[in-house]
Structures are given as structure tokens and as C-alpha cells.
UniProtKB/Swiss-Prot annotation:
UniProt keyword Cytoplasm, yes or no: yes
Organism: Talaromyces marneffei (strain ATCC 18224 / CBS 334.59 / QM 7333)
Protein location: Cytoplasm
CDD domains noted in UniProt: MetAP2 (cd01088)
Keyword tags: Aminopeptidase, Cytoplasm, Hydrolase, Metal-binding, Protease
Region annotation (Disordered) ranges: 1-107
Designated name of the protein: Methionine aminopeptidase 2-2
Listed Gene3D superfamilies: Creatinase/methionine aminopeptidase superfamily (3.90.230.10), Winged helix-like DNA-binding domain superfamily/Winged helix DNA-binding domain (1.10.10.10)
The keyword Hydrolase is annotated on this UniProt entry: yes
PANTHER family named among the record's database cross-references: METHIONINE AMINOPEPTIDASE 2, METHIONINE AMINOPEPTIDASE 2-2
Amino acid sequence: MGAKTFEGGDNHEDATNALSTKSNAVGGKPRGANMLEDGDGEFGTDDDDDGDGQDSSLAVVNPEDGSKPKKRKRSKKKKSNKKKPGDGAQQQTSPPRVPLSQLFPDGKYPVGQMVKVPAVNLRRTTDEELRYLSRGTITNDEALSDYRKAAEVHRQVRHWVHETVHPGQSLTELAVGIEDGVRALLGHQGLEPGDSLKGGMGFPTGLALNNCAAHYTPNPGQKDIILKKEDVMKVDFGVHVNGWIVDSAFTVTFDPVYDNLLAAVKDATNTGLKCAGVDARVGEIGGYIQEAMESYEVEINGKVHPVKAIRNITGHDILPYRIHGGKQVPFIKSKDQTKMEEGEVFAIETFGTTGKGYMMDGPGVYGYSKDPDARNMHLPLASARALLKTINQNFGTIPFCRRYLDRLGLEKYLLGMNSLISHGIVHMYPPLVDIPGSYTAQFEHTILIKSSGNEIISRGDDY
């Protein structure tokens, strides 16, 4: 979920974090292919990983003398009862409805892609590292397990999206399907007060089409949109467990004409992930992202368009129950000297466009979120007080949308919502759009910054 900023803004609030399936994505490459090209990471290598759950490549070997192999009597193959790590008695369904607790009864969830960092100044112990170490390991291990669980939910749900999304599908059907899958896999339907704070959506499912880059979700009262073959759709959704939010996004197309646009954005996101690390400066990362992104062009309807990095939305750090922390990672080079620190979690995302590269507020409302710094104050409207109580009990500072309020059975809440917005208690998010006729794409991953090696928590087979 992109954070909107102003072009050229170099001053950002500094915040320190408390945490110091196989699918075919359109325009993407298998995870193994990326490892061969990148050469800088290993998927699923960690002290907690069993290490034998990955696919291996098989080569056909002919006899050295060139003779035909001798015929042998075939023996019946015995079915292997060996299960991969994390396999439970059940397999995931389509749509996904089997809770992860049944698929991973031991509570050990897959590790993300472990990325080695250069061995620079290993004897240095910074204040940030001391703060991280002083927090102890038990809480951190629990939080990391929650993160990995949220990431596995994201992977399994988006696998279903890759397998089933098609032209002619309504965006409401797709959004509800994603959210129903997340809630089912976590075992939290979120219909009782406090339940969705234990686990659920990290923010409303974003399904932005074409020139709309981000912050669109189908809501009550809007005309339902039907997906078309020529559409470019950004699928951006978050999953949280106990407030630890995994934020990851990808782009779906049905026409290969957009392949270069998707390749540019995927390359830019992977570049940002490679550059992330302890002491990395966000302004410099933005420069590398921009260089990768803008080395591409795409031909659409006989016209060649340079792919531009969008200037006024950014990646961001993630705090407990807060999808946008105080740090931002731009997609363009800037003078921002803000550093990444040990134990921080970032959403490294990039947006590319064939348009102007500058986002404007579009019509309508995507969703809302409570300001974490909102002061307690008297609200004159009873409807506003009742709505705020519902928000505190069900969402806290996690973003939500009108569909979620309707799902809880709320009615006639818009007057109370407007009161909360006018008092600065709740923020409203509009869709973010480029010029009409342009096309935008997005890819995003959640990464944990560690001096011993970063973990791309949300990495999967698809992207």
C-alpha cells in the first residue's frame, strides 16, 4: 500500500520499529530463475528452516557409450508417505478455506528469501543494534513467526488469485474472495469485537485499474466494475497477525503488450530490495530504483512510451498495527539521508507508468484509518461516538473501508464518519490516478532489515 508524499519532499519523520505455493504471475519468472540471475539470495535458508521443502531440478542423463538403455522389468512404484515440512493432514482448497493452523500444526511457517549482505564493518556496534538486542529474543521470535504466518497466508491467497482471475470477473467478487480467504486461513472472521485485531486484513484489498495506480477498492454504492482483457490491474493487499503486517502487491494483465511495463516495475522493485540494508540511505535507494525503472520502454498501439517512475508516492516502513510508519522509500533519486536501521520492516514497492509520473487524487473514497496520534476529545454527535467505538474495537489504526463496516452490520454511519474526519481523528484515502489513457503497474514486497542478512518475508514462487 503506497504512501503518498509530495514531490521533492526530503524531510521525513524518523520512527523505529518495535521488531528490530507455486503460481504463475503474469509477466514474472519462477523464483529459481530470479535466484540464478540475481545471485544474492537464498529462499528459505535460516536456522529455523528444515531446508528440505524446496523443489530440485532434475537432469536427464543418457548412457555414456551412447547405447540404448537396457529394458528392465518395471516394478510398481510405492507411494511415498514422506511429507514436506509444514504438510498437515489436509491440503489447501480452492478457494482457500483451510486454516493455516491445520496445514502447519507445528507452528513453523516457511522462511522468506534470505539475502546476504556485504561484510562491511562487522566490528561496529551501533546504538540502533544495541536497542534491537536489548529488546530480547523471545518477543522477536514470536513476532517473526507471526510475520511468516501472515506471509504464507498472502502467498496462498494470491496463488488462488493467479489461478482464477479472468476477464469478465467483477472486482467486488475478487476483493471479497481475497478477504474471505485471508480470514479463513487465519481463523479470524472478524465479526466479534477484537477478533480482527488478532489477525485479518492489513488494509482493504486494492484493485486499481489502468491509470489508477493505487487506493481503489469496490465499495457499496458504487457501480461494480467488470475486469476486461485489456486492463492492467494492481492487486495490493495486506495480511496481519497480531498487528504485524505483510504488505505485498503484484500486477495482472491478460495482454502481452504490457509485458515490458511489468518487467520494468518488477526489476525496479527487486533493485530496491537488493539495495536495502542497515545504514542504507533511502534517497540513494530511490536513485537506483529510478535508474532500473526508466531503462525500459513499452510499445502500445504502435506508440513507444518510456516507463516513468511515479514521483509522489513511496514505499514505507511498517510499524505494529500501522501500515505507514515514519520513513519513506522514494522511487526517484533524492537528497533524503534517512537510514534504514537494524530490525526495521519496510514495504519496498515501486510504481511505473506510461503517463506523467505524478499521482492526483481521483474521485471517490478508497478507505479510512484512525490517526494513531489522535487526541481524546468530546464528540457532539452520538453517531460519531458510536462509530469511533466500533473502529477502536475492530480496526484500531489498521485501514478499513465501507465494505468492512457494512459487513459488521453498521447503517447510516456517513454523518458520523464525516464528523470523525473533520475532527482529525480519522483520515480518508482517495484513489490515486495518473492522466487518462495511461497505464500503471506495481510490485511490492515486505522485507526485514538485519545486519546478518535481510529476509524478504513475502517472497514466493510467483514474484
